[in-house]
């Protein structure tokens, strides 16, 4: 049975108010607070009109990480627009949800460099716990209507969040997949020390397309090689896979 991931009426403003104070710099930037108020009002109006909006926790990507704790940024575009899918983390869905095609290609690319043993878990929370920010540029969507809340104010908010992370003095990795994400490179400060890796979006429509195919890009390995040079702990990209005990392990 699919998890009920519908956003409840009159909850988005409270979720925004409960964000860690470390994000307040971005949310207090000129025009950002107004944009956030605008999108909250739009979402509440759509809910009052009977629309189904996903996910239940649009700001989840920010609730577990402060900007200084972010080590890797992966940008998505729009939450999944089907029931039981979106959970507030870019590309991530609950473990019992069918694996979306883009996430399947992400796992395929990881598997080129790392052994994927066990049952794949589609919930990418284990990455978040290691400092990976999984941020969509629009944070809500209506059922069956992709990009329905794009251009409603979310981009102003998420651009400010991206900028705050990019201005943090600790170097980070930015994985920019597809033209939409790559356009955000313009928000990086001049002379930054970050590692920026670009490739096509992992969608089946573009994952193997030249000149910068996603499949074969090596971004997960390159990220860890760079983190190692920085003296940082590597990301366990296989952490979402659930170990299946061998038959012998059940013996007494």
From Swiss-Prot:
The keyword Nucleotide-binding does not apply. Its main location: cytoplasm. The active site is at residue 78. Keywords: Cytoplasm, DNA damage, DNA repair, Hydrolase. GO terms for molecular function: uracil DNA N-glycosylase activity. It comes from the Bacteria. Pfam families: UDG (PF03167). InterPro entries: UDG_fam1, Ura-DNA_Glyclase_AS, Uracil-DNA_glycosylase-like, Uracil-DNA_glycosylase-like_sf. It catalyses: Hydrolyzes single-stranded DNA or mismatched double-stranded DNA and polynucleotides, releasing free uracil. The keyword Cytoplasm applies. GO terms for cellular component: cytoplasm. Disulfide bonds: none annotated. It is found in: Cytoplasm. CDD domains: UDG-F1-like. Its EC number is 3.2.2.27. GO terms for biological process: base-excision repair, AP site formation via deaminated base removal. Excises uracil residues from the DNA which can arise as a result of misincorporation of dUMP residues by DNA polymerase or due to deamination of cytosine. HAMAP family: UDG. Belongs to the uracil-DNA glycosylase (UDG) superfamily. UNG family. This is Uracil-DNA glycosylase. It comes from Bordetella avium (strain 197N). The lineage of its organism: Bacteria, Pseudomonadati, Pseudomonadota, Betaproteobacteria, Burkholderiales.
């Amino acid at each position: 049975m699919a998890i009920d991931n519908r956003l409840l009426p009159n909850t988005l403003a409270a979720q925004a108010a409960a964000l860690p104070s470390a994000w307040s710099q971005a949310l207090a930037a000129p025009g950002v607070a107004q944009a956030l108020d605008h999108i909250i009002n739009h979402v509440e109006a759509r809910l009052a009109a009977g629309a189904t909006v996903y996910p239940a926790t649009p700001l989840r990507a920010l609730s577990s990480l402060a900007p200084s704790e972010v080590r890797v940024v992966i940008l998505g575009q729009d939450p999944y627009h089907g029931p039981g899918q979106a959970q507030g983390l870019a590309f991530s869905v609950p473990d019992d949800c069918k694996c979306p095609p883009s996430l399947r290609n992400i796992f395929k690319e990881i598997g080129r460099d790392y052994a994927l043993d066990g049952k794949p878990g589609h919930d990418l929370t284990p990455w978040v716990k290691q400092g990976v920010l999984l941020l969509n540029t629009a944070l809500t969507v209506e059922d069956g209507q992709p990009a329905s809340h794009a251009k409603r104010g979310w981009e102003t908010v998420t651009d400010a969040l991206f900028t705050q992370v990019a201005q943090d003095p600790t170097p980070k990795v930015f994985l920019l997949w597809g033209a939409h994400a790559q356009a955000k490179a313009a928000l990086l400060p001049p002379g930054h020390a970050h590692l920026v890796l670009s490739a096509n979006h992992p969608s089946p429509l573009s994952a193997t397309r030249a000149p910068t195919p996603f499949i074969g890009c090596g971004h997960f390995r390159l990220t860890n090689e760079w983190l190692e040079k920085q003296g940082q702990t590597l990301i366990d990209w296989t952490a979402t896979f659930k170990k299946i005990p061998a038959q012998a392990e059940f013996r007494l």
